[in-house]
Design a protein with these regions (language model features):
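General secretory precursor processing signal
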Residues: 4-6
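Polybasic, lysine-rich low-complexity intrinsically disordered segments
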Residues: 16, 21-24
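Pepsin/retropepsin-fold aspartyl endopeptidases
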Residues: 29-172
Length: 172
């Protein structure tokens, strides 16, 4: 009988600890100002001269990526052209980045690619945020921009039933 009481006390102790942690997590979540975003949207990249471009929100991806081509390094400067001539937002303008990095990105099939990373900004919900973008060829993809968890964390909650939430607010 005493072992049953001990087990009950232990169970209640563990249960109280779990509930305290859940209450803490819930109160932390309530204090965060997160915006609901859908699975796809349209965004502006002011520093890159790109407006109203289709983006896909991908919580499975850690990094964010943008379609670009003609990527090359010349005398410690990264040069590239965003999008491609088939894309309606293509302007053919060559962009120069004196500050950039290289990172390893693991694809969904486990393959590792090394990509250039540049810092830029993105406008969503009429607010401008800093964003790290890896440069990749996404010409075979429906969305030229993929937004990953690194950018979404602590700013957005993704509702997969919604689309174009930010763009709809921009149109108002």
């Amino acid at each position: 009988c005493s072992s049953l009481l001990l087990n009950d006390k232990l169970f209640n102790l563990v249960l109280n600890k779990v509930l305290q942690k859940k209450k803490y997590a819930f109160s932390k979540l309530q204090n965060m100002e997160k915006v609901v975003i859908g699975r796809t949207d349209r965004a502006d990249f002011p520093a890159l001269g790109i407006a109203d471009i289709d983006i896909k929100i991908d919580t499975g991806a850690y990094t964010s990526s943008i379609h670009c081509n003609h990527i090359r390094e010349e005398e410690n400067v990264l040069l590239c052209t965003f999008l491609d001539p088939k894309h309606p937002e293509y302007n053919g303008k060559e962009m120069r980045f004196e500050s950039y990095d290289i990172t390893a990105v693991k694809s969904s099939n486990g393959e590792i690619q090394y990509r250039y990373v540049v810092q830029s900004n993105i406008r969503l919900f009429q607010k401008v945020y800093k964003i790290s973008l890896t440069l990749s060829s996404r010409e075979d993809m429906r969305f030229p921009v993929l937004i990953g968890r690194k950018f979404l964390t602590k700013k957005f909650i993704v509702d997969t039933e919604l689309t174009d939430v930010s763009h709809a607010q921009k149109a108002l």
